[in-house]
């Protein structure tokens, strides 16, 4: 017993906090869900640790802890961050107010630009000026800087963001201003725009820096509280935090750069999904994560998550590399309601975990989870591993007014809500696939999250996906995915240059400088779990005159060879044609940013092998009356833990496990593959017809 050690993954969602514990010696997984404590998220984790204690886990044996969190995200969405000041180049005080002068909804003249996180009265002009190449036109005026700081102090603001024009080319004035403030006013938090991501486009760089300092106090406080409580519970280590790019960093880095954690939890789920893609021999996957609050998808192509170089959050651009994710609709807590025309709607309002759906016994609003229960998909005695008793009568009472207005029975109204939610998901998923140029028929649908496997078969049928893949622990995949993540750091150099004027020697020198910068980050981390490192080289490129770029990967080995830039030019033409269907061989090609990604690979998890089938016929543990698309069926009910390699379950069927429930539709069948995944296919495909 003395040699036992554990790895623990934690993910805090809007409704549940998930824990995934792996025994490093045996590969045995222990997974559980506990309600998220909205006002005190760390307490949800502590509640989960206490449940692990009750199962006989020695918390002092946890040697590796990874945490996906939404503290920064919630702080931004709820606009409960710090009161800040912004110092800008003289003449640019309106940068946060003007934004990009684009309506959020181009065809709606009433749509509003997001309210700046820093009001204009707290934006201070500073006399200084760099020109576009980074050379100094006007020196920084320290007296004016000092006067502005005095006003910040008099208004009792918590910190200052410094964002000067063209600082990405030369940060000298930003650094000079920060050093002055730190020396004379050490009580103030100060952040320069080039510290996080020195990329051109002034508005985007400024906004991201503002968001970082805006959410920083809440994230710092949370991490300090969490580390303290972990220590009190006997956990001997500090957590690593998942980043939006799918990588890990230590808690100290997360406290300094919390903007890198905004998409932390969902990104961990996609990383876990990428591992499933490899194990299931399904290189092309649509990940379908349905939790209590929302449904999100991501695309895995050739076993790798697709990445985005920027994201929009509450109308604010976040120009950091992140796993590309799209919110496509309702979650289990989405509220049922009728619009003015009497049409049934699902969401976007969610009941969350407090008070939760009506079937939790606390709330009064009908939600999607209540519909699942009424239609017979859920076992009221086994929800969340049996830790939460559902009340069907409460769900029916909540649905009764809706059913009356629709002139339907309660079951018909619940069934209709499920179909409305699926239709919403289908519409939005189809749009995403079309915009990215993907054919859903070439992809399988990977369902996870607490509610994903319940509706995945409906959605796969609608989009004509190859099949549905449900991993062994779908309800806690984000927590497990965090355990499989590597340490990742990205670095960027803004360099607007015509590719035809770029020599290979210059290109190599720039990438070598960036690689050193990214690699140095690893030496600053408290990391003891890296197996080896690898480097990816990327460039943002476009045809001259275009407004935005596409990502061009460069081979590290290719750079070492004696090649000229014309090989890069041809590679860009081919990439542009593949993504957009056309190319312009006569146009000049422009590089705007060079980027390097360094990956510190962590040791693989020692997963337990799947048991072979006994050869005995499968016997359902029970049967249940269910309601699907206005028809009644008698569904076979199975326990997921009794299904072994090669086992086949024909629909209609329900497969129950502690963290989720999977619904298999009529004319579909599920089988267990060699990695323990449940693969749901059309019966015709299963029999090779």
Which residues are covered by each model-predicted region?
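Terminal amphipathic helices with adjacent charged low-complexity linkers/tails
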Residues: 163-209, 554-556, 596-613, 678-686
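Glycine-rich beta-strand-to-loop/alpha-helix junction loops that act as flexible
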Residues: 69, 164-165, 193-195, 244-245, ...
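Conserved phosphate-binding loops in N-terminal lobes of ATP-dependent enzymes
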Residues: 9-12, 16-20, 28-31, 35-41, ...
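C-terminal, non-catalytic interaction/recognition modules in large multi-subunit enzymes and RNPs
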Residues: 12, 143-151, 282, 292, ...
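N-terminal glycine/serine-rich phosphate-binding loop of ATP-dependent small-molecule kinases
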Residues: 1-85, 131, 138-160, 171-193, ...
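Short, ordered loop/turn segments at secondary-structure junctions
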Residues: 24, 89-92, 165-167, 195-196, ...
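Charge-patterned, long linear interaction tracts outside catalytic cores
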Residues: 233-280, 518-558
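Glycine-rich phosphate-binding loop of actin/hexokinase-like ATP-binding domains
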Residues: 19, 30-39, 85-91, 111-114, ...
């Amino acid at each position: 017993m003395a040699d036992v050690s554990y790895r623990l993954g934690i993910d805090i969602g809007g409704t549940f906090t998930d824990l995934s514990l792996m025994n490093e010696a045996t590969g045995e997984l222990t997974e559980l869900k506990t309600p998220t404590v909205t006002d005190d998220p760390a307490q949800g984790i502590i509640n989960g640790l206490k449940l692990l204690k009750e199962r006989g886990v020695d918390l002092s044996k946890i040697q590796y802890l990874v945490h996906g969190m939404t503290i920064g995200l919630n702080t931004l969405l709820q606009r409960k961050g710090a009161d800040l000041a912004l110092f800008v180049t003289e003449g640019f005080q309106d940068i946060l107010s003007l934004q990009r002068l684009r309506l959020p909804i181009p065809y709606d003249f009433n749509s509003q630009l997001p309210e700046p996180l820093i009001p204009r009265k707290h934006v201070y002009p500073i006399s200084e000026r760099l020109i576009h190449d980074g050379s100094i036109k006007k020196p920084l005026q320290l007296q004016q800087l000092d006067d502005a700081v005095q006003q910040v102090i008099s208004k009792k603001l918590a910190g200052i963001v410094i964002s000067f024009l063209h600082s990405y080319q030369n940060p000298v004035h930003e650094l000079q201003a920060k050093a002055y403030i730190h020396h004379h006013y050490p009580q103030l938090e100060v952040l320069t725009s080039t510290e996080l991501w020195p990329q051109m486009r002034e508005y985007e760089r400024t906004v991201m820096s503002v968001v970082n300092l805006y959410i920083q106090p809440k994230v710092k406080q949370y991490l300090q509280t969490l580390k303290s409580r972990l220590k009190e519970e006997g956990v001997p280590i500090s957590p690593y935090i998942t980043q939006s790019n799918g990588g890990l960093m230590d808690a100290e880095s997360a406290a300094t750069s919390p903007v890198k954690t905004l998409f932390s939890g969902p990104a961990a789920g996609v990383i876990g999904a990428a591992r499933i893609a490899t194990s299931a021999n399904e290189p092309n996957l649509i990940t379908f994560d349905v939790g209590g609050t929302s449904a999100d998808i991501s695309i895995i192509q050739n076993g790798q998550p697709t990445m985005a170089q920027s994201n929009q959050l509450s109308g604010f651009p976040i120009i950091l590399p992140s796993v590309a994710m799209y919110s496509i609709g309702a979650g289990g807590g989405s509220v049922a309601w009728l619009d003015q025309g009497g049409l049934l709607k699902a969401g976007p309002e969610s009941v969350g975990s407090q008070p939760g759906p009506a079937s939790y016994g606390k709330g009064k609003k009908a939600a999607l989870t209540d519909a699942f229960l009424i239609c017979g998909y859920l076992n009221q005695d086994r929800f969340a591993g049996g830790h939460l008793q559902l009340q069907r009568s409460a769900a029916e009472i909540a649905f009764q007014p809706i059913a009356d207005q629709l002139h339907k029975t309660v079951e018909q109204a619940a069934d209709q809500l499920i179909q409305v939610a699926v239709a919403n998901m289908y519409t939005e998923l189809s749009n995403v696939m079309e915009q990215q140029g993907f054919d859903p028929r070439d992809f399988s649908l990977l369902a996870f999250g607490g509610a994903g496997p319940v509706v995945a078969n409906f959605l796969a049928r609608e989009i004509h996906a190859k099949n549905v893949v449900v991993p062994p622990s779908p309800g806690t995949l984000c927590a497990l995915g965090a355990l499989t993540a590597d340490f990742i750091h990205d670095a960027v150099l803004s360099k607007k240059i015509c590719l035809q004027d770029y020599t290979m020697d210059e290109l190599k020198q720039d990438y070598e400088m960036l690689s050193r910068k990214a690699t140095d980050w690893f030496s600053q981390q408290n990391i003891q779990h890296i197996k080896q490192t690898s480097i990816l080289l990327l460039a943002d490129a476009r045809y001259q005159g275009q407004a935005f770029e596409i990502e061009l990967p460069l081979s590290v080995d290719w750079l070492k060879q004696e090649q000229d830039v014309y090989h890069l030019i041809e590679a860009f033409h081919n990439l542009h044609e593949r993504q957009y269907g056309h190319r312009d061989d006569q146009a000049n090609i422009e590089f705007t940013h060079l980027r390097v990604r360094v990956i510190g690979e962590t040791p693989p998890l020692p997963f337990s092998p799947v048991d072979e089938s006994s050869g005995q016929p499968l016997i359902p543990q029970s049967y249940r009356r269910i309601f699907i698309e206005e028809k009644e069926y008698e569904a076979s009910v199975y326990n997921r833990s009794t299904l072994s390699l090669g086992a086949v379950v024909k629909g209609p069927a329900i497969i129950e496990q502690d963290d989720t429930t999977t619904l298999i539709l009529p004319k579909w069948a599920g089988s267990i593959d060699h990695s323990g995944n449940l693969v749901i296919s059309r019966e015709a495909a299963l029999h090779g017809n």
